[in-house]
């Protein structure tokens, strides 16, 4: 039977990370030159980790699914990155950032990991400023801050609405330096399709060259997964089209535990679905909730007129508007956490108060902000976001309210990792959104960038040394070993099987079916009947995929449809595990909302007595039910309580 050992250091919470660093094992410079590390992914987490390893003297193989690391999905992050510098002198501190993150995650995250995240947050800002990241500054030249959901302080550093882009360019510059020095070898347009184990340790990967179609083998002393989340299991999401969960999923099928798979985040401010042919959704930054006010009509008749296109939002007078977040949550108003804001929007729309032709939208209105601050100030703060909205929605948000609706955005679940960010497979690490470690049941806005850079710059450079210190006598592995041969044969057989189906349905059609199943049954509101239905339908969809998918072209060539088919096969299985996990967790917490478990006011109702744990799923084989283990969550610094954002 597997055991769960999170390796949390002993001692007071505030001293754990310092004590770890003081007593960890080290690798001297001469030995670092003999050790190889594979980093899969070149987003913020992957690029920062690869650059850090190269700077330290390790030999790094870095894999990028795009044609350049600059196209990683991290570039899409808009609003900002959190850090506890307290530049605004408004009461912020490392402890408050830690507490807000624990509370925002609905008390389903490890205290030790979250405190470390808050502790290193300030160093991230210093690092990025040193790299030249152009953070917004106040008139006097000091770095500026704004507020995000789930906090009552301004701790979010930003670069207009392009923070992810600017941070990624900083990490990319550091990575490029190491590529130029020869310490990092960068493989662009490669997709990892399997991890190779030798003597139960991660010692390499198989990756498909997406240009030639060739399967290639790569060996190393350790492997780092930094491939992001699995939100595209819902088909429509704010994720980039290439974002997928396949690398993490293949690690799961080789023995790495998958943690809290049901914890998916619905972002409250996304541009609503516009038609059946849409392939992705567009996020509108959470920063807009600083000055934008969310509302629906008070009168159902006005909602009907909006839905029929008879009037516009600006035609409804102030006294007939329901600013429902301000009404329900006066202490936080429009800056409640994402899960709370999303459920509130869904409740209003389900009650018939939606404001577009589908009834699935609410208003995000800047009329008051423009009156208070002036259009020039609003344009300076949010201009590029307003331009993006106008191009997509064909409406001027300076003159008429934006329309928004929740959409899948981020996954808090991922590969289980211990305090050192290592999975249950020795030598296999997971960082950034690919792991589960820091956000519990709900991530606070502006904390994804914080975690990615914390893991890559300030955590794994220490913990990787601690692991590799015992590997310095291990010689480099040949990719001709039987373990690589067997893994490649299994992968080639899988690809051949997909290519030989020659069915009647396209990959996109089947992916849309998956999306409907997931959104309708494993989305914002979940119940036993819906989850049971999802499990049955997902099993049927899996059978249809393997009997009726059509993939044109050749396997040994550039073939985008084959890429999508391989990912979809994994998404179907990921969706099934998500449904099982959601079924097992008989409580509501954060992004996991079981309709049977809510308060009289419709808020999430946790069950700390029975479900204060991380669910850790172990793969048992094809068509066999996975086994779930529990990592019990112990809270020594915080007192668990039902979240209250009303006072």
Show which residues each predicted segment covers.
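Conserved N-terminal glycine-rich FAD pyrophosphate-binding loop of Rossmann-like flavoproteins
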Residues: 67-99, 265-269, 276-280
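Conserved redox-cofactor binding core of oxidoreductases
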Residues: 124-214, 226, 270-283, 289
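Glycine-rich loop(s) and the adjacent beta-strand/alpha-helix scaffold that form part
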Residues: 222-281, 439-462
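Short hydrophobic core segments
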Residues: 38-40, 218-227
């Amino acid at each position: 039977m597997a055991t769960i050992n999170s390796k949390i250091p002993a001692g007071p919470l505030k001293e754990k990370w310092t004590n770890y660093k003081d007593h960890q094992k080290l690798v001297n410079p001469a030995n670092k030159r003999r050790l190889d590390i594979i980093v899969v992914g070149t987003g913020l987490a992957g690029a920062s980790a690869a650059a850090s390893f190269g700077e330290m003297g390790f030999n790094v193989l870095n894999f990028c699914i795009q044609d350049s690391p600059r196209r990683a999905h991290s570039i899409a992050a808009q609003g900002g990155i959190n850090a506890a510098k307290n530049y605004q002198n408004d009461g912020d501190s490392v402890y408050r950032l830690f507490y807000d993150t624990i509370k925002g995650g609905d008390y389903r995250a490890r205290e030790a990991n979250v405190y470390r995240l808050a502790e290193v947050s300030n160093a991230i800002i210093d690092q990025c400023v040193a790299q030249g990241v152009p953070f917004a500054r106040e008139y006097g030249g000091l770095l500026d801050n704004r507020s995000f959901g789930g906090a009552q302080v301004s701790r979010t550093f930003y670069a207009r609405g392009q923070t992810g882009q600017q941070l990624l360019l900083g990490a990319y510059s550091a990575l490029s330096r190491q590529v130029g020095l020869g310490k990092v070898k960068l493989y662009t347009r490669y997709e990892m399709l399997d991890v190779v184990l030798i003597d139960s340790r991660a010692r390499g990967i198989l990756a498909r060259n997406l240009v030639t179609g060739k399967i290639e083998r790569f060996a190393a002393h350790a492997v780092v997964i930094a491939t992001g989340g699995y939100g595209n299991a819902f088909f429509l999401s704010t994720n980039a089209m290439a974002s997928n969960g396949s690398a993490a999923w293949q690690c799961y099928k080789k023995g790495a535990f998958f943690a809290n798979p049901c914890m998916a985040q619905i972002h409250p401010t996304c541009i609503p679905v516009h038609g059946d042919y849409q392939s992705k959704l567009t996020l509108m930054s959470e920063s807009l909730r600083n000055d934008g006010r969310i509302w629906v009509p008070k009168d159902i008749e006005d909602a009907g007129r909006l839905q029929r296109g008879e009037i516009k939002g600006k035609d409804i007078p102030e006294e007939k508007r329901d600013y429902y977040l301000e009404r329900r949550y006066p202490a936080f108003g429009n800056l409640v956490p994402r899960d709370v804001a999303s459920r509130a929007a869904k409740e209003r729309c389900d009650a018939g108060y939606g404001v577009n032709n589908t009834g699935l939208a609410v208003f995000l209105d800047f009329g008051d902000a423009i009156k208070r601050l002036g259009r020039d100030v609003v344009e300076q703060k949010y201009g590029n976001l307003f331009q993006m909205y106008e191009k997509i929605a064909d409406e001027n948000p300076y003159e008429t309210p934006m329309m928004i609706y929740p959409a899948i955005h981020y996954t808090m679940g991922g590969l289980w990792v211990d305090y050192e960010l290592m999975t249950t497979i020795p030598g296999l690490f997971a960082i950034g959104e690919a792991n589960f470690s820091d956000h519990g049941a709900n991530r606070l806005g502006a904390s994804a960038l914080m975690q990615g850079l914390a893991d890559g710059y300030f955590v794994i450079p220490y913990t990787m040394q601690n692991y590799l210190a015992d590997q310095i006598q291990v010689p480099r592995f040949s990719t001709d070993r039987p373990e690589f041969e067997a893994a490649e044969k299994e992968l080639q057989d899988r690809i051949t099987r997909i290519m030989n189906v020659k069915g009647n349905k396209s990959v996109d059609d089947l992916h849309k079916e998956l999306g409907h199943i997931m959104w309708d049954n494993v989305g914002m509101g979940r119940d036993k009947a819906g989850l049971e239905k999802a499990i049955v339908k997902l099993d049927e969809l899996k059978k249809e995929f393997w009997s009726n998918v059509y993939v044109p072209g050749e396997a040994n060539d550039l073939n985008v449809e084959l890429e999508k088919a391989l990912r979809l096969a994994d998404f179907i299985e990921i969706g099934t595990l998500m449904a099982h996990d959601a079924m097992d967790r008989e409580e509501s917490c954060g992004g996991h909302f079981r309709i049977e478990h809510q308060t009289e006011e419709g808020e999430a109702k946790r069950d700390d007595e029975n479900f204060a744990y991380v669910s850790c799923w172990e793969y048992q084989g094809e068509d066999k039910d996975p086994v779930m283990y529990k990592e019990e969550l112990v809270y020594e610094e915080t007192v668990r309580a039902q979240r209250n954002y009303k006072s």
